[in-house]
Amino acid sequence: MKKVLAIILGGGAGTRLYPLTKLRAKPAVPLAGKYRLIDIPVSNCINAEILKIYVLTQFNSASLNRHLTRTYNFTGFHDGFVEVLAAQQTTENPSWFQGTADAVRQYGWLFDEWDVDEYLILSGDHLYRMDYSDFVKRHRETGADITLSVVPIDEKRASSFGLMKIDDNGRIVDFSEKPKGEELKQMQVDTSILGLNPEQAKESPYIASMGIYVFNKKALNDLLKNNPEQTDFGKEIIPGAAKDYNLQAYLFKGYWEDIGTIEAFYEANLALNRQPRPSFSFYNEKAPIYTRARNLPPTKVLNCNITESMISEGCMIKDCRIHNSVLGIRSRIETDCVVEDSLLMGADYYESLETRQSLLDQGKIPVGIGKGSTIRRAIVDKNARIGQNVTIVNKENIEESNREDDGFYIRNGIVVVIKNAVIPDGTVI
């Protein structure tokens, strides 16, 4: 895989994941208590021995850069690296990235310097485990110019994805980006051609692009150079290439979830607790997911009732009840709290006992969840200060609300407490 260069698309402003992207780039959003979204594609690359990795981003990239620098230091791999490329304005390109393809085009001069045969284009906000070496191998065996990784999908979700039709040889003959109505119906196919049984084919009659591509180096360079007005892979480059290039589909059979929205992100995190077997597991020795080694102490649990939950390292929780929740690193939960169906991202630092007591004496709130608080169906971002006897349960069943001045948003009925928020004692949300 030394002849493959990976390019991870960090996405735009991350509006669908806001407010989690208020102070960080989308790939830097915490995941499963101790990871970040970017760890998924980078780990998949490392496991496939693809060690030349660029990450393209244009918003709030400082924390992403810091995480990647501290985590992925390929000392000893003479040409291995993970590097962030932020959008920059030049005389040739005075504007920011206009889309996924434009982002790659603007750094084409840099990618072109590498002696590689293929570019592996990845997304930074998906949860899945894939053997990219198998993906690239299939691309080479079929003699494709471009190979798309695809999944069969049901009608309910089909209009949110790029859909395609393929022939008996797996070649893509038609492609439509997020079709609606009659155009959607025309993209319906017999997915048994992918190896699904009749029942599965009936349930999932569409073939969806995962937004993961392998391009031959020359094919991508030509497409970007000859179509300067085309700025997006899914909307323009791929549909336009179907006629003149050999486009192949690669069926991915594992778990895959686009977690680019608050609701999908919340559901994917809590699904990690599902019994008896979650759809995605971080407990896989053959294909581990890597992240930064933080050297934190073990979690301390004092007289708690914890069920179906994931607790990261370095937490301190006492005399509380936790059910179907994910607790991030350095989470602190005081006595008589109830946390249910929630994602707590934890903290970036510890406060000493003296500091915490001093804050309480001044009527201020330490980092963590204060005594007697109840949190249900919520996401609490890092370093939040939740006071005592606070209730966060979306009491009025509001679907959408922007209350940034009060320290929270509501998205799809999920309360999202923003990073560094302060929620006063006795607050009811």
Swiss-Prot record:
PROSITE patterns: ADP_GLC_PYROPHOSPH_1, ADP_GLC_PYROPHOSPH_2, ADP_GLC_PYROPHOSPH_3
InterPro entries: ADP-Glc_PPase (IPR011831), ADP_Glu_pyroP_CS (IPR005836), GlgC_bac (IPR023049), NTP_transferase_dom (IPR005835), Nucleotide-diphossugar_trans (IPR029044), Trimer_LpxA-like_sf (IPR011004)
EC numbers, comma separated: 2.7.7.27
Recorded GO MF terms: ATP binding; glucose-1-phosphate adenylyltransferase activity; structural constituent of carboxysome shell
Record has Protein transport as a keyword: no
Catalytic activity: alpha-D-glucose 1-phosphate + ATP + H(+) = ADP-alpha-D-glucose + diphosphate
Entry coiled-coil feature ranges: none
Gene Ontology biological-process annotations: glycogen biosynthetic process
Keyword rRNA-binding among record annotations: no
Positions contributing to alpha-D-glucose 1-phosphate binding: 162, 177-178, 209
HAMAP family for this protein: GlgC
PANTHER family (alphabetical): GLUCOSE-1-PHOSPHATE ADENYLYLTRANSFERASE LARGE SUBUNIT 1, CHLOROPLASTIC-RELATED, GLUCOSE-1-PHOSPHATE ADENYLYLTRANSFERASE-RELATED
Family recorded in the similarity comment: Belongs to the bacterial/plant glucose-1-phosphate adenylyltransferase family.
Assembly and interaction partners: Homotetramer.
Annotated protein name in UniProt: Glucose-1-phosphate adenylyltransferase
Native organism: Crocosphaera subtropica (strain ATCC 51142 / BH68) (Cyanothece sp. (strain ATCC 51142))
Gene for this chain: glgC
